[in-house]
Structure formats: C-alpha cells, structure tokens
Amino acid sequence: MSKKRLHEIAKEIGKSSKEVVERAKSLGLDVKSHASSVEEADANKIASSFAAGVTKDAQAGSAKDKQVAEQKAKAAKATTPQPAAATQEASQPVAVKPKSRNFKAEREARAKEQAARRQAGQNRSNDRKSDYRQLGRSQGQQTERAGHKSQNQQRDRRFDNRPSSGNNRNDGHRQAGNRDKNRSFNANSRQQDTGRQGQTQAGAPKIDFKARAAALKAEQNAEYARQRESRFREQEEAKRLEQQARQEAKAAALKAQTEDKKHREASAKATEPIASMAAAPVAKPVDKRRKKQNRPDKGHDRDHGLEDGQKKNKKSWNSQNQVRNQKNSNWNNNKKNKKGKHHKNSNTAPKPVTERKFHELPKEFEYSEGMTVAEIAKRIKREPAEIVKKLFMMGVMATQNQSLDGDTIELLMVDYGIEAKAKVEVDEADIERFFTDDSYLNPENIVERAPVVTIMGHVDHGKTTLLDTLRNSRVATGEAGGITQHIGAYQIEEAGKKITFLDTPGHAAFTSMRARGASVTDITILIVAADDGVMPQTIEAINHSKAAGVPIIVAINKIDKPGANPERVISELAEHGIISTAWGGECEFVEISAKFNKNIDELLETVLLVAEVEELKADPTVRAIGTVIEARLDKGKGAVATLLVQQGTLHVQDPIVVGNTFGRVRAMTNDLGRRVKSAEPSTPVSITGLNETPMAGDHFAVYADEKAARAAGEERAKRALLKQRQNTQRVSLDNLFDTLKAGEIKTVNVIIKADVQGSVEALAASLLKIDVEGVRVNVVHSAVGAINESDVTLAEASNAVIIGFNVRPTPQARQQADADDVEIRLHSIIYKVIEEVEEAMKGKLDPEYQEKVLGEAIIRETFKVSKVGTIGGFMVVNGKVTRDSSVRVIRDSVVIFDGKLASLKHYKDDVKEIGNAQEGGLMIEGFNDIKVDDTIEAYVMEEIIRK
C-alpha cells in the first residue's frame, strides 16, 4: 500500500499540520512530525475523524439551507411534467458518503460557477429574440426542456449538499428529449437553454446564487475562525505551561538557596566552641568579595609590620590598577616579593602545606644501555635534581636529559642500595619469534578456532570447481585458460562451524605458492580426477603436505564421467604412501562430483571430524600474527595484502609489520568484499595501508604503537637489503674460470611485471628453470603493477624484454617503448610465456607472430538484452576496430578478458570495421561483464619472417 505524509493529508482536508499530527497521535499512530508517513488506511482514518467533527458542526448550521432546497424541489416537481422513467431514475440525487471538506475544490467550483453566471448574463439579451421563436415549437420540445430544467435544479441541489469538484456532469440530461439534437450541444449551450427556460416559464423557481455564495463564505469564515481560536488556545496553553515551569524552577532554586544558607549557619554554630577556646578574639565575618581588594602590608618583615601601626596601615603609592598590573608583570612581582614575601594577609587563613609522599625504593632495577637521568628518576620515584647531585658527588657531570652508560647506572644503584640488572635486549624486528614461542599466549583465553583447509591437486582436476560449489559462486569463470593463477582464501559455514579454504594453483610453476599454502594449513584436501588418476603435481602436493605434517583427505572427483575409475586412483595413491582407512591406513577418501554437487556434505563432515580430532586452538585476546596469502598493487588503493590471521584478533587502525614493510590497517575487507572492523583467528582478510607491497608468504605481526612498528619495519628492510648485497658473488681465483665461461653464454634479459606477487614469483622461477645450452634467462627486475616509463627506461638500458602478465602498459609507457624500440610482450597464461621464452632461447621462432594493435575504443553505454547478452556501445578513440580482430577488455590497466568479437554493428547494420571517432556496438564471445569506461583494445597477430 502507498504511504502519505501528514502535511499532504493536512493540505487535502484543509487543516493545519499541527492539528493533523495531534489527531494522529490521539488515534494511536506512531508519528513524530508533519514529515512522518502513514499508510493509506491510516490516512483515511485521520481524514474521517476530522470529517466526523466537521459534519456535526455543519449539520446545525446548514439546516435552513436544506429546508430551502426541499421547498425548491417541491415547487419544481409541481410545475414540471413527469419525464420518462429512465430520466427520473437518473435525476434522483445520489446518496454521497460524508467526506471531509476540501476548501480548495470548493473555491475552484465557486469560481467556475461565477464564470458561468457571467456568461449567462451576457447572453440573455441575445437569447430574448430566440425565446419568441421557441414559443412556436412543439409541445414535445417544451416538455423536453422542462425535463432538462428539473434535472438541472436537482443537480444544483446535489451541488449544495456535497463539496463541488467543478467537473460534475449531468448524465441524466443526455438521456431525455431529442437525442439527435442534444448530442450536438455542449455544456455551455445546455446551461444557456436552461437559463432561457427559466425566463420563459414564470412559474419555475429561481436559484439565489448570491445567498448561496454568502452562506458558503459565512461557513468558510466560521471554519477559519474556529481554526484561529484553536491555534490561539494552543499558544496560550503553551505559554501557561512554560510560565509554570519557570516558576517551579525559580521556587526550586530559592528552596536550594535557603537550605544552603541554613546549612552554613549550622556549620558556623558548630565551629563557635572551638573558636572560643582560642586566645584570640572572634573576628567578624568578612565578605569574601571584598578580600580580593585587600592588599598585604608593605613591611620588610612580619615583626616590623606588627610593631609599627602606621606602617601597617600605610597605603601603597600605587593605585589599585597599578597593583593589578604589578601582578601581571614579572619585574614588579619580583620587586614586591622581595619586600613583602613573608607578610600574610590577615583576612585569609593559611593554606596547609602538602607533604611530599614518600616512595619506597625498588629492590631491583632493570636498566638498559643509554638510559637518561630523567628516565631513571621516574623509575625509582626520585627527583632528577637528587640524582644529578649524586652523580656530581661521584665525579660525573650530567644533566637530566643526558644518557648514562651501564657502569655509571650500576654505581648509582649501588649508592641507592638497589640491585641493578641489565635488561635482556629483545630483537623487536624479529617477528618470527611469535611463531616459534607460544609463551606469550594465555592458557585461560585459548578457544577453538576454525580449520584452515588447503585444496591441492593437478591442473584441471576440479579444485576451483569444488571451491566454487562450496561457495555457490563462479570463481572458475574468471580464470584465464581455466587454471587458477594466484591463491584465494574463502570462508564458509557448515553445521554452525566455520571452515576457511585456500585455493592453490595446480600448475608446475606455482610450486612456491603450494608450499606456502601447505605451511599455513591445518588440513589438506587432495583432489584427484577419477579419469586421470595420479599426476605429477598430485605427487608434489603429497610431498608438501607430508613435509608440513598436515593430515590429508583425498577427494576423488569427476566420478560422474563414463571413464571414471576410483579404485585405480586408490591403488595409485597407495604407492605414494596415501592409504585409505578402508585398507587400514590413516587417510580419509571421499568420492565426489564437484560439478553436480554430489557427496559435498560428506566431504565437509569429514573435514569437521578431522579438525575435531586435531584440536585446533587459538588465543583471540593477544595481538594478531599470521601469514600473507597474496599481495598486489591496486591503482586506487595502493598496496593490498591478503592476510590469514593465525593468532589473536586483527583490528582496523592496528600498527602492523608485514615482511619488510610496515603501516597501519586503514581498511579491512573479508572474502565477500564487505568491510569489517576485526578479524579473528583463521579468518582471511584483505588490508590496505602498507607503505610497500609485501611478498607472498611473509609473516606479519601487530605492534603496540606505530612508532615501534615503523622502527621494526625499517630495520627489517635494512637487513634484507644488506643480505641481498652480501649474496653478490665476487670474482676470485677459484671461480675465475667459471666466470670467464659464463661470459661466453648468451643471456636473455627480461623484466617481469604482473598483477599479484605470487604470479611474479612463479613466472621468475619458471623462466630461470628453462635449460637451454648456451643461453640463460636473466631477470633484471620484477615487480607488481602496470608497466610504466621506469620499466621502459630500464629495459632500454639493459637491452631487456618486458613481459607483462595480466597487466597493461600506460599510454606514456607505450609511447616511450615505441620511441626507444623496446619490446613489450603481454600475456595472461603462464604456459604461453614459458613456451615463448623457451622457443626464443632455442631459436625456434621461425616464423614469428607479432601482435599488432589496430585501435582502442571506450565503452560509453551498455545494453543488456535477454537471450542475447550484453551489448557495449563504444566510441573508437584510436585506430579502428575490425570484425575479425581479437579484443582485450582492460579495466584499470588490468586485462580481465581476451577473446573474439561476436558481432560488430554501426547503428543497425553489420559492418566489417569502424574507424576512428566513430560509434558502434559490439558483443564479445563468452563475456557479458562489460562495464562503462572499459577499454576495448583490438589487435591481430601478424606472421613475420625472422631475420
């Protein structure tokens, strides 16, 4: 149902908003002001409540009008012949349900009525001539017009008895008399005919419009008067209540003042016996406000002032303003204090001297090298001046801000009789100690935590599909080539318990990422395809899990395929030490179908059972520690790191050290992309606020304050740089021959830029493993982010090839690369990168395919068509877009899709190409996630002959 605001209801019924709000509150509705909304039924209830009150007032006032209307109706009935039965039924007044008055509608009706009367008066002179002609008409026509007049009079009576709307139509008028002639008349001609009939027939009653208008105006004025009177009464009542509240507050203040006065008199009487015991006479009470004007005598000392009465009563030559200025002047203060520093004002009682609290010296003192005198004084609860004095007696000249060595501190503590102990220095930059030593955990606060489960297996065995089924999402559709290329962490809930899943890539290049996933996991789900069996990466995942000491749950996937053979998988895994519990082993085996959601619940129950056996615990009260799952550089947010909290609770604004970087947690999002303020153990979150992008696999720890975190992060970065410099191999006599031999080897210099840190590591490791005799790969630089001008400059200086993985160069970098003749290779699948570099090293690039960019277009608008897909309306900003070209969808300098065009149109026509500065529409095969401001890059692969 629709809602209405109270001020709209007030406007419709002609009441003030305040009255409507009060009436709504009296009806039990929950409203606050005139802007509150109510349902339509409640609005009708409010309007009807006002209408009921108005009807009662109007009934008494309009009794005379009703009597006059009844007399007119009787006269018309007597003089008018009886029309047809249908006309009588139509002309009867309709019983109208009493409504609330609408003054606006009444004013409009009166205006229309007055306009009609003026028009009728102007046409009377012209109508007199036509009246003589009408006397010769037939009796049937006269009867018909008499019926019209009777109907119009009845319509006027209905107009008097209900609010007029100005659009009332006399339907009965159309049913009587000559229908052919009446259809040609409009509303004005009918009114003129009715007026003429009134002139020709002397016996017909006339309507007194002036009397009726005066009655309406009087009724409206009475209503306005009632409203003004009610508002005046409300204002008077509010003033009375306000005055009453002020009087009550004043009475309460007077009562409190009287009680305070009585209390002071009682306390003064209680102190009189004590004062009488003293030898001095009782002094009169002195007004406190006058004490400020009394000034101390200017005697040289107290005795002299007491002996000499003239000097005691002598006024200062300075006026009161000068004395006040002397208080604000340091020079005058010093001068006057020298004269009368011992003199006290006789009117003020002496203030008691606060005694210094005595603090016991500590029995032991733990010091660190370089402590200052002020720090030592604060620790042993002594004044710095006292310690400086002791040091001076020992022959050491020091100030309170001067640092002391260990021997001096020990001698000082011996003088005080305190046992001094040197503080054991803890390397604050070493965050690895939190992962090896559990002594900082409180056993009373340790609670159960969610298990961290890593899904491992060979390429395309269904790892991401299984996780997709668990999360009811479509993660697998976003991976280029159908393989997962960087780790993802997600959390689901099963049977009231949370489970954290880590999805690792299965490709051989991502060995380090799989090892990293095994190091932070609690349970490993080894997924094996029932039709493929055990593959190389399956064996590698088994070795990683065994090295980490993690229990393994085997999920035999794709059992729905015709060639599935789970028994063969079980026997092959038994050869590698993975024995099923059915065969007497320790590993759980579950046959599933991730695609058709078969036995997924059984797999989750097995995970919870193994987690319960492992007894996974954590302390959520300590400062958080954990591991970096993934890190990347976002264009708008900066460094973004995906963290897995292992101990403690991570909060927003926590100072944190992540690997060799530091910062403060500015924002934190969970796996669903929602902002969170805290993350408990076993929870994956993405954070921002780091000064640099950390490395995937680094540990992180939260520090007490930002100063300590900054110091630890800078120290760790310094140590990492020093270690990198020490690893530089220097030429010696022993390796001289190897160095000369290496100089003959040709090198392929590459610069690697990728979207995430894990992809950078995997790509660099894969390229370095390529073994081609006489050629080796040299990774000059690797980083996260888009290809920029600095990368092009470095590539030109080192004669290197830039390899971009899921990133794009900036327009400035592309222009500089074209000018400097620097080659940029862009890829989205790691297979292609390895194959291309390997064949380049082997010299098997004949023929060679070179990418040629045809043009770029910007998406201006998108249109979603059912059963067709998403159509992107674009404008070509550079070059052209052809029908047979391949396209890349670039969003924030990151390639999100690479494919072919499904259609290319200019308006409604299919075209082969669209040139520069032209608009068109396109559809991309297998991709509907086109958004406004996406960049569409059209390119073709041209075959060139290697020279």
From Swiss-Prot:
Residues 593-595 are annotated as: G5. CDD domains: IF2_eIF5B, IF2_mtIF2_II, mtIF2_IVc. Residues 557-560 are annotated as: G4. GO terms for molecular function: GTP binding; GTPase activity; translation initiation factor activity. Keywords: Cytoplasm, GTP-binding, Initiation factor, Nucleotide-binding, Protein biosynthesis. PROSITE patterns: G_TR_2 (PS51722), IF2 (PS01176). It holds the Pfam family IF2_N. InterPro entries: EF-G-like_DII, IF2_II, IF2_N, P-loop_NTPase, Small_GTP-bd, T_Tr_GTP-bd_dom, TF_IF2_bacterial-like, TIF_IF2. Coiled coil: none annotated. GTP binds at residues 457-464, 503-507, 557-560. SUPFAM superfamilies: Initiation factor IF2/eIF5b, domain 3, P-loop containing nucleoside triphosphate hydrolases, Translation proteins. It is found in: Cytoplasm. It comes from the Bacteria. Residues 335-345 have a biased composition (Basic residues). Residues 63-73, 103-116, 125-134, 170-183, 225-249, 257-267, 294-311 have a biased composition (Basic and acidic residues). Residues 76-90, 190-204, 316-334 have a biased composition (Low complexity). The keyword Transcription does not apply. Residues 457-464 are annotated as: G1. Residues 55-361 are annotated as: Disordered. Residues 448-617 form the tr-type G domain. One of its GO terms (cellular component) is cytosol. Belongs to the TRAFAC class translation factor GTPase superfamily. Classic translation factor GTPase family. IF-2 subfamily. One of the essential components for the initiation of protein synthesis. Protects formylmethionyl-tRNA from spontaneous hydrolysis and promotes its binding to the 30S ribosomal subunits. Also involved in the hydrolysis of GTP during the formation of the 70S ribosomal complex. HAMAP family: IF_2_B. This is Translation initiation factor IF-2.
